[in-house]
Amino acid sequence: MTPMSDGGTSESIFDLDYTSWKIRSTLAVAGFVFYLGVFVVCHQLSSSLNATYRSLVAREKVFWNLAATRAVFGVQSTAAGLWALLVDPVLHADKARGQQNWCWFHIATATGFFFFENVAVHLSNVLFRTFDLFLAIHHLFAFLGFLGSVVNLGAGHYLAMSTLLLEASTPFTCISWMLLKAGWSESLFWKLNQWLMIHMFHCRMVLTYHMWWVCFWHWDGLVSSLYLPHLALFLVGLGLLTLVINPYWTHKKTQQLLNPVDWNFAQPAPRSSRPAGANGQVPQKKGQ
């Protein structure tokens, strides 16, 4: 299917010829470079302006900058996803095959972002000898899924945009973690943000159910428009999100509201009996 233009607008980034592989790949590279730039700028600004950031160890600084970068991407993804979910008539007319030029822009730049995420996460794992299985799986499936959409000119955009809307939780996750490290876990603002974040994770679960509904009612269109490996990858990834990853993360975020501990960097063994410090870390007891 030929990508459909929004129409009625002057020349813009959305009016490019997205049937051109050169344009799509250039935007993917631009997405990678832009979010790498966000990561670097966050490091520079935080180093200059934030005392909490300067007190963190190297691995926590990487996580801080990644959280901020994900939050920026989350804003882009939320705007695009909500427009597709609630407004765009072309995508609603054919949820399996409908396309829009503005969607091509977001799909291509999202591919660059998810490639950046995979590079950053795996470099961090190698440097600090860590490994988060759920995070690695989530980012691998996201990158391969969006890469498939960039490559395939016939792929519909509704489900891809719905997938981007799953990133709506990232700004709240960023705020939660940064405030926790700054020692604000007892503040009303942190607790309110935590409630909103938990709500967003529940919304993620509802959104995955909606995506299954779309797959069920538009199955023939999906089979005819997607390559079989791409469709299989999407269904497996959606299944993991629905049954494992979303429930696990929702549980952990709810648990964190009741017990404000930075479980991303919990100490491997207790060093003393002191309570949680300003950065939200406590010695982890055996058996927890």
From Swiss-Prot:
<dbReference type="GO" id="GO:0055088">
    <property type="term" value="P:lipid homeostasis"/>
</dbReference>
<keyword id="KW-0523">Neurodegeneration</keyword>
<dbReference type="GO" id="GO:0008203">
    <property type="term" value="P:cholesterol metabolic process"/>
</dbReference>
<comment type="function">
    <text>Could play a role in cell proliferation during neuronal differentiation and in protection against cell death.</text>
</comment>
<dbReference type="InterPro" id="IPR006634">
    <property type="entry name" value="TLC-dom"/>
</dbReference>
<feature type="transmembrane region" description="Helical">
    <location>
        <begin position="25"/>
        <end position="45"/>
    </location>
</feature>
<comment type="subunit">
    <text>Interacts with CLN5. Interacts with CLN3.</text>
</comment>
<dbReference type="GO" id="GO:0005783">
    <property type="term" value="C:endoplasmic reticulum"/>
</dbReference>
<feature type="transmembrane region" description="Helical">
    <location>
        <begin position="71"/>
        <end position="91"/>
    </location>
</feature>
<keyword id="KW-1133">Transmembrane helix</keyword>
<dbReference type="GO" id="GO:0006644">
    <property type="term" value="P:phospholipid metabolic process"/>
</dbReference>
<keyword id="KW-0812">Transmembrane</keyword>
<feature type="transmembrane region" description="Helical">
    <location>
        <begin position="103"/>
        <end position="123"/>
    </location>
</feature>
<dbReference type="GO" id="GO:0005793">
    <property type="term" value="C:endoplasmic reticulum-Golgi intermediate compartment"/>
</dbReference>
<dbReference type="InterPro" id="IPR050846">
    <property type="entry name" value="TLCD"/>
</dbReference>
<dbReference type="GO" id="GO:0006672">
    <property type="term" value="P:ceramide metabolic process"/>
</dbReference>
<dbReference type="GO" id="GO:0007399">
    <property type="term" value="P:nervous system development"/>
</dbReference>
<dbReference type="GO" id="GO:0033116">
    <property type="term" value="C:endoplasmic reticulum-Golgi intermediate compartment membrane"/>
</dbReference>
<keyword id="KW-0225">Disease variant</keyword>
<feature type="short sequence motif" description="ER-retrieval signal">
    <location>
        <begin position="285"/>
        <end position="288"/>
    </location>
</feature>
<protein>
    <recommendedName>
        <fullName>Protein CLN8</fullName>
    </recommendedName>
</protein>
<keyword id="KW-0256">Endoplasmic reticulum</keyword>
<dbReference type="Pfam" id="PF03798">
    <property type="entry name" value="TRAM_LAG1_CLN8"/>
</dbReference>
<feature type="region of interest" description="Disordered">
    <location>
        <begin position="269"/>
        <end position="288"/>
    </location>
</feature>
<keyword id="KW-0472">Membrane</keyword>
<feature type="transmembrane region" description="Helical">
    <location>
        <begin position="131"/>
        <end position="151"/>
    </location>
</feature>
<dbReference type="GO" id="GO:0097001">
    <property type="term" value="F:ceramide binding"/>
</dbReference>
<keyword id="KW-0525">Neuronal ceroid lipofuscinosis</keyword>
<feature type="transmembrane region" description="Helical">
    <location>
        <begin position="225"/>
        <end position="245"/>
    </location>
</feature>
<feature type="domain" description="TLC">
    <location>
        <begin position="62"/>
        <end position="262"/>
    </location>
</feature>
<dbReference type="GO" id="GO:0005789">
    <property type="term" value="C:endoplasmic reticulum membrane"/>
</dbReference>
